[in-house]
Amino acid sequence: MANLIPWFTRRNFMTGSAALAGSLAVQAQEHPTASLGAGESFSEYQERRRRELWGLLGDLPWNHKAAPPQRVRTEKHDGYTLERWVLDLNGVEPVPALLLIPDHRQNPTPGLLFIHWHAGQYDLGKEELLLGTSVQPPYAPVCAKKGLVTLAIDSWCFGERKHDANGHRGEEDTFKEMLWRGRVLFGMMMLDEFRALDFLAGRPEVDPSRLGAFGMSMGATKAWWLAALDPRVRLTIDVCCLTDFESLIEAHGLSGHGIFYYVPSLLKHFDTAQINALIVPRAHLSVNGRKDPLTPPAGVEKIREQLLPLYRTYGREKDCLIELFDCAHEELPEMRKQILEWTDRYLVAG
C-alpha cells in the first residue's frame, strides 16, 4: 500500500467513504502542494485542490449576473429536435449553443455536454455535433438514439465566436489580451463550459444526477478538466488528448497544441495525473492513439499507473479505463464501441 497514491506526501489519512475507511500510507513527491494536510480526508483534499485549480485560471467573472438565455430558433431533425440558443455565460460576449432533445427519451433523461475540438477549424465549433469531422463521425444521431439531451457551445474564437477572418490570429490575440487583463483564455473557456453545464442541468428534461462530458482533442482536454473542476460530471469521456505534461515536453509535442492549452504556472502546482485525481472515483474513459503526437504513449501509461490504484482503493477499478489504440489522432470504430458502452452503462442505465 506504500505506493498507492504516488504523488501525495507520506501520511496516514482517513476518508469518510466506506471504501477508503482506514488509514492509507502515501508517498512523497517534490512539490508541497501535492500533499494531504494532517487529518485531511481524500474528499477534503480534492475540494481544496479543486479550489487551487480554479485559482490558476485567472480573474474569472464569478459575480456576473447572467441575462436569461434566449432561444433563437427550433429545427426538426430525424429523431430529435434541435434548439439554437444564445447563452450569457461570462458577461463579456454571448455564447451561441445547440441543444439536442431526442424524440424518445427517459423522463427525466441523462444530459451530455459535447465539447468541440480545435484542429484549426475555427469555423466549425459547436456544429461538430451535427457534422462530425474527418476523423470522427457525427454524434448527433448517436445522442438522439441514446436519448441524451445534448448541449454544445461555441468556444472562444470558434464558430459564431470567431471574430477574425484569420482564426489562428484571433485565438492568439484573444489569449494575449486576456493575459494583459489578468485573465487566462483556458480559464474563460472552462468557465463557459461550467456555466453551460448549469444550463444543461437546469433543463426540465434532464436528470441532473446523470451528466456527462465528452470531447475529442481540445474537447477531450476540456472534458477531463471540467470533470476535475466540477463533481456534477458523472461520466467523463475523452478522445485523443490525455497525456502527462512532462512526457509531452520530453516528446517535443508542445507545438501540437493551440495556445489556449497553456495555463500560466500550472506545472508548479499540478501535473496531469493530479488534475485527473480530482475525478476519482467517478467514471472516466480515456481513449488515445499510440501514434498520436499529442498523446505520447509513455505519458498515457504514466497517468494510468497513477490513477488506477486510486480507483482500486474505492473498489471502482472498472470505472476507470485509459486505453491506447494503434492509431494517430482519430477515433477508431473500436473506440466508439467503448464510448457507447460506457454511455449506456453510466448515463443511460442510470
Give names to the regions the model predicted.
Residues 305, 310-350:
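C-terminal catalytic histidine-bearing segment of alpha/beta-hydrolase fold enzymes
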Residues 172-216:
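Gly/Ser-rich "nucleophile elbow"/oxyanion-hole loop immediately N-terminal to the catalytic nucleophile
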